[in-house]
Amino acid sequence: MSQEFNEIDANTIETNYDNVVYSFDDLNLKPNIVRGIFGYGYESPSAIQQRAILPITEGRDVLAQAQSGTGKTATFTISALQRIDENLKATQALILAPTRELALQIQNVITHIGLYLNVTVHASIGGTSMKDDIEAFKSGVQIVVGTPGRVFDMIERRFFRTDKVKMFIMDEADEMLSSGFKEQIYNIFRLLPETTQVVLLSATMPQDVLEVTTKFMNNPVRILVKKDELTLEGIKQFYINVEQEDFKFDCLCDLYDSISVTQAVIFCNTRSKVEFLTTKLKAENFTVSAIHADLPQSDRDTIMNEFRSGSSRILIATDLLARGIDVQQVSLVINYDLPANKENYIHRIGRGGRFGRKGVAINFVTDEDVGMMREIEKFYSTQIEEMPANIGELFN
């Protein structure tokens, strides 16, 4: 499977590190990593990989601003695998992610790219058996991918010994720091060896993220995509003025009458709205799955697998799941509610066109939402057009 990336023009990247490597063969990687990279479907590095893998494998602190669909997960996966001492049975790399789903996806990428290496990886996440965590740490698992709460708990209980950790990677740092994990993350930082390398990936650079860079990073290499380039290429963005909340559902049904879509993700701002919309759509005979943070992990896994396999055509989700829904065939994202946090907009609509695939995002905008939509346009230097009457043609 060949991987395509959203093209990023070199002129849109600001960096204080000038070494750009255009081939995986020139990155001085272990031969079995290169074998795993090609086996996974990568042919040449994406823009972020060309610039970030080398400084990370050299042990430098790195701050990379990259959105979904740019190959950022493989960037730190490849780098972590390169830095692991395969003979040392102890945790050497810690990767934090804001959601369980994202942590499991990262674990999956590490497993695939590290297929030909003797490296162990474990996901330490909430909603799973603590016994599995304890056994993994006792066995000397080398890479841990986890969510902040569970990881901190394991460190506090002294099952996770941090003395051999040489790499700390934070993915979606902006989301983690704004989601109430800040204190746990700071506590984790303080329990790691002082010499630990820090790699931070974030789609946006709010104050919380910049604060971490000054407190915990040492002269980091910065690779920043300019803000006005952050909206994913290939996503057509539209809005429908629904005037008021009560009109949204009828509008959604009308929309489905006029388009033919394989699969869609619909985002709502609250769990209660997700449940309300699911019930209403099922009553209209739509095949719908719903997913939110309060569901048990096993249910969430089942629902995601159903959606990936195509047995469910519509996935309704809250913002927590905006990061980590990796479904290749999604061609339409509907923001039933505009996100309350404008920085989440990119993560929602980015689902529709991962790795350069085209996608359509449709925003339902009430009269009260117009101001927020203008803020989103300004924040991303983008334009959200009114939905044309011939919208169906985009899906033929």
Swiss-Prot record:
CDD domains: DEADc_EIF4AII_EIF4AI_DDX2 (cd18046), SF2_C_DEAD (cd18787)
InterPro entries named among the record's database cross-references: DEAD/DEAH_box_helicase_dom, EIF4A_DEADc, Helicase_ATP-bd, Helicase_C-like, P-loop_NTPase, RNA-helicase_DEAD-box_CS, RNA_helicase_DEAD_Q_motif
One term of GO molecular function: ATP binding
Amino-acid positions noted as binding ATP in the UniProt annotation, renumbered to this chain: A66, Q67, S68, G69, T70, G71, K72, T73
E.C. no: 3.6.4.13
Keywords for this protein: ATP-binding, Cytoplasm, Helicase, Hydrolase, Initiation factor, Nucleotide-binding, Protein biosynthesis, RNA-binding
Pfam families: DEAD (PF00270), Helicase_C (PF00271)
Residues in the signal sequence: none
Family statement drawn from the similarity comment of this UniProt entry: Belongs to the DEAD box helicase family. eIF4A subfamily.
Function: ATP-dependent RNA helicase which is a subunit of the eIF4F complex involved in cap recognition and is required for mRNA binding to ribosome. In the current model of translation initiation, eIF4A unwinds RNA secondary structures in the 5'-UTR of mRNAs which is necessary to allow efficient binding of the small ribosomal subunit, and subsequent scanning for the initiator codon.
Protein name: ATP-dependent RNA helicase eIF4A
Organism (species): Meyerozyma guilliermondii (strain ATCC 6260 / CBS 566 / DSM 6381 / JCM 1539 / NBRC 10279 / NRRL Y-324) (Yeast)
